[in-house]
C-alpha cells in the first residue's frame, strides 16, 4: 500500500468538514494524508474541488474494513493480496473529481424523471453497460485499475469493476446494494440490489 502518514475517517463530506481537513493538511504540509469515506452519497465534484489537491480520498464502497480483513489471505496471480483492497480504492483528489463528474453525468438523466427504485436500477445499469467497455485484457491489470471506480475514467473494466461502480451508483441513490464475491476457478463479481417495490 502507498505510504500514508495518516488517515482522517469521516462518515460524509460537507463544506465545513472540508475546511477542517484542509486546515489539518495546512498544519502538516509534509504529511501524506487521506480521507476515508464510506461512499460518495451527497458528495459532488464541485465540493471535492474545495479539498486540498494534496489530500487523497479512500472511498470504501464495496471494500469496507470487514471485507478487507476477510480477504487478507487471498493471493492473486498479479502477486497482490486481499489487503491490497485498502489501497486500490484510494484516489487522488483529481481522480475522485473525475469519477464523481462521470457519475453526475449519469445521474443527470434521472433529473425530472419520476423513476421508482427499480427504474433507477435499470437506467443506471444500462448507462454502465453501454458507456463502459468490458475488456478481458483488464483481468491481468492491478486491483487499483479493475477493482475500483477508475472504470468511470478509463471507460474499461471487468466484472469486479462493474460491480464496484454499480454499487457506488446505488449508494448515491440511497438504494441498498451489496457487493457479492466468491471463490471459484473463474470468479465473477456482481451486485445484489434491493428494491422496495
What are these regions (language model features)?
Residues 161-197:
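Hydrophobic/aromatic-rich core segments of domains that either
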Residues 148-160:
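Periplasmic OmpA-like peptidoglycan-binding domain that tethers envelope proteins to the cell wall
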